[in-house]
Amino acid sequence: MTNFPKIGKTPPNFLTIGVYKKRLGKIRLSDYRGKKYVILFFYPANFTAISPTELMLLSDRISEFRKLSTQILAISVDSPFSHLQYLLCNREEGGLEDLNYPLVSDLTQTITRDYQVLTDEGLAFPGLFIIDKEGIIQYYTVNNLLCGRNINELLRILESIQYVKENPGYACPVNWNFGDQVFYSHPLKSKIYFKDLYSPKKSS
């Protein structure tokens, strides 16, 4: 039995076919190592209800992910030709016309199974994995099939991961957004932050 991918560990590699800008090509996860962060964005299947709302918003905000040197790979158990048909359909029909990142085919369900997001019905749970430039898993979530994911939260998490990796010794507190106060990750030093945050405020 495959172990569930763990934070701080190398994710299962894969080589498969993807579709980008209506062209089919090979996609290998390890090719991004040393170059970019990668978001693996699993979704149940093409032409479902929730998936296009997530996938199109990711596409509309692709510039924000590119600024963070991040590649999005959307993965489902559909064939490359199903992906191509999905990309040929316009938004009004629930399609993904002009999508700004690849759709990855996992027709054999190998990738979905390796990442432990395969449903009993043979679809993919809405799983999400953030992999850093060193090829290490830094974050993952798995959602209810009928609950859409929050792209603002995804960007916030991505920025916080990059911040703490680039600034050793610091941590990002609750609801942190880029530019907000950070504090020391050491338990003793972090008390400086707690004192400032929770001490009674003096009235003027």
Swiss-Prot record:
UniProt xrefs under PROSITE patterns: THIOREDOXIN_2 (PS51352)
Catalytic activity annotation: a hydroperoxide + [protein]-dithiol = [protein]-disulfide + an alcohol + H2O
Entry's Gene Ontology molecular function annotations: thioredoxin peroxidase activity
Residue ranges occupied by any Thioredoxin domain in the UniProt entry: 5-163
Keywords: Antioxidant, Chloroplast, Oxidoreductase, Peroxidase, Plastid, Redox-active center
Record-listed E.C. numbers: 1.11.1.-
Family label: Belongs to the peroxiredoxin family. AhpC/Prx1 subfamily.
Annotated protein name in UniProt: Putative peroxiredoxin ycf42
Gene (name only): ycf42
